């Protein structure tokens, strides 16, 4: 991007556009804000906004996301008779957490030693009641069929998924739009009407009109180091929140560790997960990857040597997260439990050697425990026509702790198919919605606003500031009200002042602006839900409320945007659907 240090690279038009901001920058320097370091600076776009083009596409059903859930949502919606489009911020099968997931669970009644009922009961006991047994059963019941279809497409023959994902897509001649950043879900007359965003490869705004939308956008975090989620920022969840969808699961935490050596090098810690072919896992219910290690590190202030998940540390530490004794294990964990080399390469098995480092997946909850609130077993949200699947759906399939290895990928496949069939049925009963010209203009202005801003905050700097607020162990993992409220004050400042002033100079930075904004809203959700849940359970631990409270907190927390624009929180009792 051109800078003020290279005046010959600046046209007269661009110079005039930013000249008014220069005086402001001088004042900012007096306040200790340095444009040189990117906090706040003049914006000199590389893009001629006046030459941005516009494209509109239409289909019965729009699938957003190119991972496992998106694949099955697209294929099954087509097979159910809908005209389908798939749009992805990345590449089909190569973005989000799907490329990293190498274990997929299959419940095979012919070989499994326990019944389906027993499996669901085991998951419920491990999850301490936080799972939705309807979605637990649904995942197990349909997992084998989805695994068999993946086998037909060549899924288990390569560590890379793009080719096998493309096989059923190309056979059905389904339209796929890759490297499109969706920034807005569009609602008209109380129901979903489509989505809009921009291309990362050309100066073009895209509007997609559809009768129904299935969000397969995954979960997200705060772009932490050491775990492969840096392209996931809760985009789908936050877009849906802005149009009135209910969101759940923000107080829970994913406990995947990184490694202390080269902590920011994701491939160093998890490379074997990307390089090996996927496999099938069988029934083995765990209670893993909560915040046990975070608590141990907090209490001892020492590096914690990695042990087998489910096994208490040798040194007795008083208090901490409750683990059902039934799920304390003595055997080695499944291979995808921790970042280590494959034993065949001479390294220790995952989770059994080295020094772990926390915060590697900061901002993400347990798989399937956060996202849009389903109003039924069909992955349907409270917005007519809007569905979600996989990590974008707060189905509580496994509860608020990791229970069954491989069920995350299986759940994405199963829910993608379930959502597709329900959405296709919905499409048959409605007409194609009209999107008003006023709405089109409003969305386009919001997309282009960061490029038009004469000066503002760098999204990279705001992201780093947010990480400094949210990722400390004593904020997001080991919680107490005073610190949660202190962090919330900072996040609300970012929301109210810095977020409206984010600027972008090119398409890459424009993507970062929207991702940063989504992370700020997600941080607010996490802090407010963590303050509201006054107990400790599974992957949520409060120092000031260290015990489980079954009298008051056998409930999930749902979040929605009020009519005044403020964030509203409510309880939804376990074993119930939202009202």
Region spans (language model):
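N-terminal secretory signal peptides
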Residues: 1-11, 37-39
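N-terminal export leaders
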Residues: 11-19, 28
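Conserved N-terminal/central alpha/beta ligand/cofactor-binding core
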Residues: 18, 50, 82, 89-204, ...
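Glycine- and aromatic-enriched mobile tails/lids
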Residues: 22, 43-52, 57-59, 73, ...
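Core beta-strand elements of the Rossmann-like FAD/NAD(P) dinucleotide-binding domain
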Residues: 57-59, 203-212, 382
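N-terminal Rossmann-like FAD-binding beta1-loop-alpha1 element of flavoenzymes
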Residues: 61-85
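Glycine-rich loop(s) and the adjacent beta-strand/alpha-helix scaffold that form part
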Residues: 212-264, 402-422
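C-terminal catalytic lobe of FAD-dependent flavoproteins
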Residues: 299-372, 383, 390
């Amino acid at each position: 991007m051109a800078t003020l240090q290279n005046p010959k690279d600046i046209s007269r038009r661009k110079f005039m556009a930013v000249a008014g901001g220069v005086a402001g920058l001088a004042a900012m320097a007096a306040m200790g804000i340095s444009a040189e370091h990117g906090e706040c600076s003049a914006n000199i776009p590389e893009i001629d906004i006046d030459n941005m083009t516009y494209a509109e596409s239409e289909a019965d059903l729009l699938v957003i996301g190119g991972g496992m859930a998106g694949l099955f949502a697209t294929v099954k919606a087509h097979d159910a008779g809908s005209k389908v489009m798939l749009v992805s911020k990345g590449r089909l099968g190569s973005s989000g957490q799907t490329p990293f997931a190498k274990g997929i669970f299959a419940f095979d009644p012919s070989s499994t030693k326990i019944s389906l009922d027993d499996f669901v009961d085991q998951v419920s006991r491990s999850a301490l009641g936080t799972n939705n047994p309807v979605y637990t059963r649904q995942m197990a019941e349909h997992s084998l069929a989805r695994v068999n279809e993946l086998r037909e497409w060549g899924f288990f023959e390569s560590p890379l998924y793009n080719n096998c994902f493309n096989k059923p897509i190309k056979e059905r001649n389904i339209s796929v739009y890759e490297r499109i950043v969706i920034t807005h879900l569009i609602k008209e007359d109380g129901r979903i009407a489509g989505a809009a965003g921009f291309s990362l490869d050309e100066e073009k705004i895209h509007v997609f009109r559809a009768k129904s939308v299935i969000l397969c956008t995954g979960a997200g975090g705060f772009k932490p180091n050491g775990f492969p989620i840096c392209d996931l920022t809760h985009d789908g969840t936050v877009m849906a929140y802005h149009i009135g969808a209910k969101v759940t699961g923000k107080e829970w935490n994913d406990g995947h560790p990184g490694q202390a050596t080269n902590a920011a090098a994701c491939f160093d810690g998890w490379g074997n997960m990307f390089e090996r072919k996927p496999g099938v896992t069988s029934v083995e219910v765990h209670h893993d990857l909560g915040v046990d290690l975070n608590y141990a590190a907090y209490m001892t202030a020492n590096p914690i040597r990695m042990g087998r998940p489910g096994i208490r540390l040798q040194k007795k530490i008083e208090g901490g997260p409750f683990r059902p004794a039934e799920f304390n294990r003595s055997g080695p964990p499944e291979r995808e439990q921790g970042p280590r080399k494959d034993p065949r390469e001479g390294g220790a098995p995952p989770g059994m050697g080295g020094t772990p480092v926390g915060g590697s997946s900061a901002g993400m909850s347990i798989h399937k425990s956060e996202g849009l609130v389903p109003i039924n077993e069909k992955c349907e949200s409270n917005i007519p026509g809007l569905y979600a699947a996989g990590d974008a759906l707060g189905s509580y399939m496994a509860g608020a702790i990791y229970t069954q290895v491989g069920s995350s990928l299986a759940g994405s496949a199963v829910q993608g198919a379930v959502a597709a069939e329900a959405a296709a049925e919905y499409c048959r009963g409605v007409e194609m919605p009209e999107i008003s010209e006023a709405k089109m203009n409003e969305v386009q202005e919001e997309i282009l606003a960061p490029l038009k801003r004469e000066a503002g905050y760098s999204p990279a700097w705001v992201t780093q500031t947010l990480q400094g607020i949210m990722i400390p162990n004593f904020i997001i993992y080991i919680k107490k009200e005073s610190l949660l409220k202190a962090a919330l004050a900072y996040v609300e400042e970012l929301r109210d002042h810095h977020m409206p002033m984010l600027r972008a100079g090119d398409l890459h930075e424009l993507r970062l602006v929207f991702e940063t904004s989504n992370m700020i809203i997600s941080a607010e959700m996490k802090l407010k839900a963590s303050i509201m849940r006054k107990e400790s359970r599974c992957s949520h631990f409060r120092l000031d409320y260290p015990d489980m409270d079954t009298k008051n907190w056998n409930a999930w927390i749902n979040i929605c945007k009020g009519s005044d624009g403020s964030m509203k929180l409510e309880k939804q009792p376990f074993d119930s659907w939202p009202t």
